[in-house]
Amino acid sequence: ESNLTTIAELWGVYLERHVDPSDVAVMMTMLKIARIKLNPKNSDNWIDGCGYLSLGAELIVDKPEPEPPVKFQGGKT
Protein backbone atom coordinates (compact mmCIF):
# COMPACT_ATOMS: atom_id res chain seq x y z
CA GLU A 1 0.00 0.00 0.00
CA SER A 2 2.79 2.46 0.81
CA ASN A 3 4.08 2.26 -2.77
CA LEU A 4 0.63 3.07 -4.15
CA THR A 5 0.34 5.91 -1.63
CA THR A 6 3.70 7.35 -2.70
CA ILE A 7 2.75 7.14 -6.38
CA ALA A 8 -0.63 8.75 -5.61
CA GLU A 9 1.09 11.65 -3.85
CA LEU A 10 3.51 12.20 -6.74
CA TRP A 11 0.80 11.95 -9.40
CA GLY A 12 -1.37 14.31 -7.35
CA VAL A 13 1.37 16.95 -7.31
CA TYR A 14 1.95 16.55 -11.03
CA LEU A 15 -1.76 16.61 -11.92
CA GLU A 16 -2.56 19.30 -9.33
CA ARG A 17 -5.46 17.24 -7.97
CA HIS A 18 -6.01 14.54 -5.37
CA VAL A 19 -5.13 11.00 -6.46
CA ASP A 20 -6.16 8.14 -4.20
CA PRO A 21 -3.99 5.00 -3.90
CA SER A 22 -6.92 3.01 -5.32
CA ASP A 23 -6.82 5.29 -8.39
CA VAL A 24 -3.19 4.27 -8.85
CA ALA A 25 -4.12 0.58 -8.71
CA VAL A 26 -6.82 1.08 -11.36
CA MET A 27 -4.65 3.21 -13.66
CA MET A 28 -1.70 0.83 -13.43
CA THR A 29 -4.07 -2.03 -14.30
CA MET A 30 -5.22 -0.05 -17.34
CA LEU A 31 -1.58 0.47 -18.32
CA LYS A 32 -1.07 -3.29 -18.22
CA ILE A 33 -4.22 -3.83 -20.30
CA ALA A 34 -2.85 -1.40 -22.90
CA ARG A 35 0.40 -3.36 -22.99
CA ILE A 36 -1.52 -6.64 -23.30
CA LYS A 37 -3.33 -5.20 -26.31
CA LEU A 38 0.02 -4.47 -27.97
CA ASN A 39 1.64 -7.77 -27.00
CA PRO A 40 -0.80 -10.38 -25.63
CA LYS A 41 1.91 -13.05 -25.48
CA ASN A 42 3.90 -11.28 -22.76
CA SER A 43 2.70 -13.05 -19.61
CA ASP A 44 4.32 -10.46 -17.31
CA ASN A 45 1.67 -7.92 -18.29
CA TRP A 46 -1.12 -10.36 -17.43
CA ILE A 47 0.46 -11.21 -14.08
CA ASP A 48 1.24 -7.59 -13.20
CA GLY A 49 -2.32 -6.54 -14.09
CA CYS A 50 -3.68 -9.13 -11.67
CA GLY A 51 -1.22 -7.89 -9.07
CA TYR A 52 -2.43 -4.30 -9.32
CA LEU A 53 -6.06 -5.44 -9.07
CA SER A 54 -5.15 -7.47 -6.00
CA LEU A 55 -3.44 -4.48 -4.39
CA GLY A 56 -6.54 -2.41 -5.06
CA ALA A 57 -8.69 -5.04 -3.36
CA GLU A 58 -6.39 -4.99 -0.33
CA LEU A 59 -6.92 -1.24 -0.02
CA ILE A 60 -10.66 -1.79 0.23
CA VAL A 61 -10.41 -4.69 2.69
CA ASP A 62 -8.04 -2.79 4.99
CA LYS A 63 -10.52 0.05 5.39
CA PRO A 64 -13.77 -1.40 6.73
CA GLU A 65 -16.67 1.00 7.00
CA PRO A 66 -17.10 2.30 10.54
CA GLU A 67 -19.89 0.87 12.66
CA PRO A 68 -22.75 3.31 13.19
CA PRO A 69 -22.85 4.68 16.73
CA VAL A 70 -25.15 2.83 19.11
CA LYS A 71 -27.75 5.10 20.65
CA PHE A 72 -27.94 4.83 24.41
CA GLN A 73 -31.25 3.25 25.38
CA GLY A 74 -31.26 4.29 29.02
CA GLY A 75 -31.22 2.14 32.09
CA LYS A 76 -29.10 1.98 35.21
CA THR A 77 -25.38 1.40 35.07
Where are these regions (language model features)?
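Intrinsically disordered, low-complexity regulatory regions
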Residues: 1-77
